[in-house]
Amino acid sequence: GGSMLPRSYSEFYIDGRWTPTDSTETFTVISPSTGEVIGQVPSATRADIDAAVEAARHAFYETDWASRPVEERAALCEALATRLYESKDELAELLVDELGCTRMLADVYQATAPTLHWNYNAEVGRNYPFQEVRTADLGPLAGGSAGGMIMPYQTQALVGKGPVGGVPTMAAYNFSMPGTSQKVAPAIIAGCTVVVKVPEPNPLAVFALAQMVHDVGFPPGVINIVAAGAEQSAYLVSH
């Protein structure tokens, strides 16, 4: 355990740094268990969404992120898992505050489960066949069965699986941390970059995750984190 995690933010995490917004709107975070205001985050403008998307696109198309060995991405995921685990008490405390769940649920599902997701995806990534040779018997297509071909007619293909690019993700408010981790970790292992739209009623834990992403050394633009209402969220997924 360490010091309490922040409860209020005035900036978004975009392109590797906390980035000011010209938004005048905010989301007020109210603790369901006490009814008290415990924090706030900005509400994204179109310009903020564009900046986050541009950062993700740049990191994907203009840097070596997608072509790095999967081992490097897995190591970053494991570093983040370790950081999450070290912060699990403060995270659980924050989640009880902003989500109103019990301490037990906060401990197990919200604070501990994401550690498992990041570690699991790192392990899967290391052993995943991103490239495999496939062999097909084309004899029947070449009339082999009817024509009595003596030579087998086979073809081999190298099938590669690669990242799709920038990925927007959203998680349900009641599973903000595990939901975000379940979506972002596999995208990261694949070599994608991500824009995370946090759930507005309880954005604070995922904003805390942004600082951890920064601290363990994810490159700028690989993971971007914003808060947005329905209109700007629709704009995000329209890209």
Region locations from a protein language model:
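N-terminal Rossmann-like NAD(P)+-binding subdomain of aldehyde/semialdehyde dehydrogenases
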Residues: 1-146
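Rossmann-like NAD(P) dinucleotide-binding subdomain of oxidoreductase/dehydrogenase enzymes
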Residues: 129-239
